[in-house]
Amino acid sequence: MIHERIKEITNRIKERSKATRQAYVEQSKYNFENSTGRRGLSCGNLAHGFAACSHDEKGVIAEGVQPNVGIITAYNDMLSAHKPYERYPDEMRGYAKEMNATVQVAGATPAMCDGVTQGQPGMDLSLFSRDIIALSAGIGLSHDMFDGVMNFGICDKIVPGLMIGNLGFGHYHSIFIPGGPMPTGISNDEKAEIRQAFAEGKIGREELLKGESDSYHSPGTCTFYGTANSNQMLMEIMGMQLPGSSFVNPDTEMRRALNREAMRVLLENIRNKSFDRTIGQIIDEKAIVNGVIGLLATGGSTNHTLHLIAIAKAAGIQITWDDFSQLSDVIPLICRVYPNGAADVNHFHASGGMAYVMKTLLDRGLLHEDVNTIVGHGLRKFTEEPKLIDGEVVYKTGPEKSLNDSILRSAENPFLKTGGLRVLKGNLGTSVIKTSAVLEQNHIVEAPAVVFDDQDDVM
């Protein structure tokens, strides 16, 4: 039974969004039932669409019987998190061929790394890039060559942009494919000590660069719980990513098996022609509320107080910061992952990870269980963990309790009784603060306010 306050907030969002959501669903349903796809293309259109394909692929795509999957990729090899995507299109083509389907890269999007641009002029483009990514995804999908969508993207603005772009095609079956975090490097405490030593002039730039490089050291997502890893949590808790797939390291047998399973699931959804498993039906009011709850319970990135509002709007749903704040009153903080703890996401995954997060929240009535996902109706499936048996992914019962209470706790015994984000209002404006990363003695600060004209003045 869902918590009464969560039910009340969800119902209020539904009422507020009634007209816009209804229009969105009606348009998605019309497109789902009436889209002719490749059958509606002229011979000239179709010839252009598969000109670069092999002879066999041309015949299959032209026939229109087997699914043709469009990939939207945010690959570049500057972003460590996106480097694994370099080989994914060919890998997915192989899996699709085994399963009597074809794959084409429908389009590519920009992918910025805030870690590279922070403190630099390029950072001014970061938030704008989200909407460019959404447009880029939409352009790729507008060719009408595809029966479903596979998305390759992880980092800060990329996943929100891909979600917004995909939701513009709400009649499609879509799936998100994570790349996984890099293995753990030096500890976050050690990294902080190195930075402090540099700030105090005790070590030089060479030693600082070595410390940073020992932390960010290989392909995969950075291991702290920032926006990139919050994206992965959101995609899983909102039902757009395979259960247990978010935090599996790159270039492992399990990662490859999960990629193959993702292709199988997507093709199954396409062939079953289930409207309930299209992205526009998976991302409904309950899924959006679940995303906010996941963010609060895990102490995720404050950037999602912007992104979730935009994602929801793309699906005809209207949410506000007040919804975040009111949900925070009833959602406990159950994770301590850097920057609101010493552990990284690999430690979090080993402690029970997303399977346990969803289990303990569901058991306490703090998540909507009755939702559509890429693997069917109901979120309880996401409390299971993937195991590798004879090279195949098999789902088994997930952990019944946390394996490390200093990193992950039950909803009955949380780190904090209220969530990790708070909305602040005052005569200077409205803001959001990540309370999970603030020591309790600093929850109230009395000091003169300093007002700057622009961000450069702060520096």
Residue ranges: model-predicted function:
Residues M1-D77, A81, D90-T109, Q120-G122, ...:
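Catalytic or ion-coupling anion/metal-binding cores of large enzyme and transporter domains
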Residues R87:
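Acidic/charged coordination and interface sites in well-structured regions
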Residues G140-L162, H173-P178:
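A short, small-residue-rich loop immediately preceding and capping a beta-strand
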